[in-house]
Amino acid sequence: TDRLKILKVLANATTQMAEGEILQLIHAGNLKLTEAEYFEVITRKTAILMSAACQIGGILAGAPPAQEEALSQMGLNLGLTFQLVDDILDYTGDQKELGKEVGADLREGRITLPLIHALAQAGPPDQARLQELAQDLKSEMVPEFQALLSKYGALDHARSLARQYTLKAQESLELFGPCPEKTYFRIITEELLARTH
């Protein structure tokens, strides 16, 4: 039945989200975190929730299995886009719009893609400086930290990946014929990518 299927989707999502939270705690402050480990955390912690929500929408609407899977994939890719943009905003956003200080996630030990990428690209002197800044980021150090992220294309790399996941989310919609909902979902994908808070 649909109820049982929905319960299975929710149970799986809840389990993966809990595992994602545990992985995030295990990796807190780990400046050797890899891109693959980062994506495992955000997939489990964030993307799986959006995937489940979209899949459940498909189940409730009586979508055929292929469309249900397409909705699940759309949600997964939207979740990855959302988290990547969130991580970019942690380093570039406006404090008033975000409601938190620039670098707040980093100060809480969350190592995210922009820093992972910059550390991987930097030579030893800049790598050492990035590590110093990351371990004790004070407000007056934020401009230097942002400059190092920019120097190594870290924010552009994260934006590029967010764009790729947005396109994948949009591709998932190709299975659906023309309808207002498809248009709305396309708009949502673009708004998620362009958000500033």
Spans of features found by a protein language model:
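All-alpha prenyltransferase/terpene-synthase fold signal
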Residues: T1-H197
